[in-house]
Amino acid sequence: YPIAGHSENWPIRSQNFKRWLAARAFEEMGLAPGAQALEDTLRVLEARATNEGPERAPWLRTGSRDGKIYLDLCDASWRCVEISPLEWRLLERHDAPFIRSSAMRPLPEPEAGESIDTLRTFLNTAEEGDFRLAVAWLVAALRDRGPYPILAINGEQGTGKSNASRILRSLVDPNAAPIRATPRDERDLIVAAYNSHALVF
């Protein structure tokens, strides 16, 4: 739905959409809608979306179409970065079907000109091959569908494994819980995957 000069995507039953709908009703009619009127409207919208609306798969942090990758900055203006084989550009307005979880955190606005080698100073990699594997994981993490590589960071205690994991995660999918405890079962794993693009344990 359109709001403050941009578009946002939220489930119909979410608090964000309900607040927007109530505000629109007040703008149009000058009256606050009652609880039953709001509920009736939500049911109609659900039915129309299910039976009449075009179906589009939602994107969580990343998505792709027409040979381009889109990365949600997760900021208040819902901006995203469009990445093609030759360039990237910041999109202030777009129709990308991004959705968000409450744990997702914003990425900074990208800046041109820096080399990937800048990342070396933040990662304690012993070999050139290890650094290249980390970069390969970052690039693969921008894709919206798998298969994905699994990056296993090994080292003795105190060698910066957790710090490296946080840094790599923060570059593609910052989260309120950058490193999670190992899931106890498949259900925990599915819940974690549903709310995040990248999983770090």
Residue ranges of each PLM-predicted region?
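P-loop NTPase catalytic core of nucleic-acid-dependent motor ATPases
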Residues: 3-4, 84-195
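Segments of Walker-type
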Residues: 4-129
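Hydrophobic positions in the central parallel beta-sheet of the AAA+
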Residues: 199-200
